[in-house]
Design a protein with these regions (language model features):
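Short loop/helix-cap segments at secondary-structure boundaries that form the rim of catalytic
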Residues: 51-52, 70-73, 83-92, 157-161, ...
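Short, conserved loop/helix-junction motifs that constitute active-site signature segments
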Residues: 71-75, 206-209, 241-246, 264-267, ...
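Phosphate-binding loop of NTP-binding sites
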Residues: 9, 105-248, 252, 256-270
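N-terminal leader/targeting and accessory segments in enzymes
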Residues: 1-105, 109, 315, 504-515
Length: 515
């Protein structure tokens, strides 16, 4: 059914969000008092530059009245906002208590509630969301014949096979429901999506219930004035997935697991657990377990019974744990234990994740690692993997400006016990000066054996790391180039500036580029 002003008002009122409807001097809570209340909206947007005739405009965030200058000439049908703008527009305004919640509900309704036509899986956690999401999509694609969509921090996929770079870990609600509708129209049956803490903080998934949710792990991240003021707030937002899913997959070793179980119990949500065990019977009890297997890589079990042994293309024990979570989620949405679809786990490749290159005495890993946990995990992995070759480790990294300020110290803490040298370089920033961020990071280095320097040009920083390896040709040097993955841009003063890409720089310097 098409969304009209009357239907929008009724929906918002049902969710206790509607304050009143205002058009000029008419203030009412009954849309029938206004002309055209039953005329359908033909478009919905939160960007005044995209208004066309019969559009419903959602005013969110730091919206300003000046954005509505001359808006009546565009054919705007109505707007939703926490403030009335009768002084600048003659169109009716749906005045609400929470504009972001309202936008999510109205967007879902405008696009015909596409979530009801999909089996939706939501994945949260500090580390592993992207990898787990790709694993689940691969299994569901194999199981359904390519009918699984994906929303991730790396790429979005709306047809099961075409991937486009994403802007946000979890899209704005309006964009999410628009993409869900496109996925449904493309014949998709499943949607796998990462769910960030910000998604709950700013109501991007308000009103959305996941058929299966996952809470992988938790550690401090995204703590800043514009994200989460405290770890408690970060964890609280993450925990909301527990109240908004039909079944929950939980990391058995997750910090605060008891609290998350209490949340699930309060919402009558069944919990399934997963874990990585060092050997059979050695680890926290879990329903789904990944075990090292000398012959194949990892043996995966469900309730103590083998699902199969798989050799994962993605290296590292942490990725085996992510695969166990993916198996648990796939089982939760109906993939049978013996399905050959699980073989798809072996061939998952994620752009910019654990990209591995070798040349002479050099090994390089390009990865999106960007906080304490991901940096430490990667550094620990390569140190152990190449321990018999006594490697030197050179880390090339920076940290984003204007947000997640805790990452600056976290990245250093995660790297310095493994690194011989840390080269600090450019990352994305809006207002903060990058040189100030890098000097701050340098100040967090407490390990006296770590050599550090600053090179603002990111490509030159990687070149310095390669030169360092050449200067120590008698030893293996491992280069960890982290933070940007395969992104072909760096945000400078809030604007995207072209960048060669970490992976491309490494391949160029290693002589691995194809002509």
């Amino acid at each position: 059914m098409a969304l009209t002003l009357a239907a929008a008002a009724e929906l918002l009122d049902r969710h206790h969000l509607l304050r009143e409807i205002i058009q000029g001097d008419c203030w009412t809570d009954d849309a029938a008092d206004l002309a055209g209340a039953d005329e359908p909206f033909t478009a919905i947007t939160y960007d005044t530059r995209k208004v066309v005739p019969d559009t419903l405009l959602c005013c969110k965030g730091r919206f300003k009245a000046e954005y509505l200058t001359d808006i009546d000439t565009t054919g705007l049908a109505a707007y939703g906002a926490e403030t009335e703008y009768s002084a600048v527009t003659r169109t009716p305004g749906l005045i609400v208590n929470d504009a972001r919640k309202a936008m999510s509900l109205l967007s879902a309704e405008f696009y015909g509630r596409p979530q009801d036509e999909l089996t939706v899986i939501g994945i949260t956690g500090t580390k592993g969301k992207t990898t787990t999401a790709y694993f689940v999509q691969a299994v569901l694609n194999a199981y359904s014949g390519g009918r699984a969509a994906l929303f991730s921090s790396v790429d979005n996929c709306l047809d099961g096979h075409t991937y486009a770079e994403s802007d946000l870990t979890t899209p704005e609600s309006m964009d999410a429901f628009r993409m869900m509708r496109e996925a449904v129209d493309n014949g998709m049956r499943y949607l796998v999506m990462e769910v960030s803490s910000q998604a709950y903080k700013v109501e991007r998934v308000y009103g959305l219930t996941f058929d299966a949710g996952a809470f992988l792990n938790i550690s401090p991240d995204h703590i800043s004035a514009i994200e989460h003021p405290t770890f408690e707030d970060y964890l609280y937002c993450k925990r909301q997935i527990t109240h908004n899913c039909r079944t929950l997959v939980l990391g058995a070793d997750c910090d605060h697991a008891d609290l998350i179980r209490q949340d699930a119990q309060a919402s009558n949500v069944p919990v399934t657990t997963f874990a990585l065990h060092a050997a059979d019977g050695h680890g926290t009890h879990a329903d789904f377990v990944a075990l090292p297997d000398a012959s194949s890589g990892y043996l995966f079990q469900e309730q103590g019974k083998a699902i199969g042994d798989f050799s994962l293309e993605l290296e590292g024990e942490f990725n085996a744990a992510n695969a166990a979570a993916a198996i648990a989620l796939s089982r939760a949405v109906g993939v049978p234990t013996g399905s050959e679809a699980f073989r798809a786990l072996e061939h998952v490749h994620i752009p910019g994740r654990m990209e591995h290159y070798e040349s002479g005495n050099m090994v390089a890993y390009v990865d999106y690692a960007h906080n304490y946990v991901s940096t430490k995990t990667l550094a620990e992995f390569v140190t152990h993997k190449y321990a018999d070759r006594n490697p030197r480790v050179v880390v090339v990294t920076g940290s984003v400006g204007d947000k997640a300020v805790d990452r600056r110290e976290g990245i250093i803490k995660g790297a310095q016990d493994y690194a011989d040298r840390i080269i600090l370089t450019a990352e994305d920033t809006v207002h903060e000066r990058m040189i100030d961020i890098l000097h701050e990071m340098q100040g967090y280095i407490t390990n006296p054996r770590v050599v550090s320097d600053i090179e603002l040009d990111r490509a030159k920083a990687i070149e310095k790391a390669v030169e360092d390896a050449h200067a120590h040709a008698d030893r293996l040097t491992i280069l960890l180039v982290i933070g940007k993955g395969e992104e072909r841009w760096i945000k400078v003063d809030g604007k995207h500036a072209p960048y060669e890409g970490d992976d491309h720089v490494v391949k160029r310097l290693f002589g691995l580029l194809n002509d």
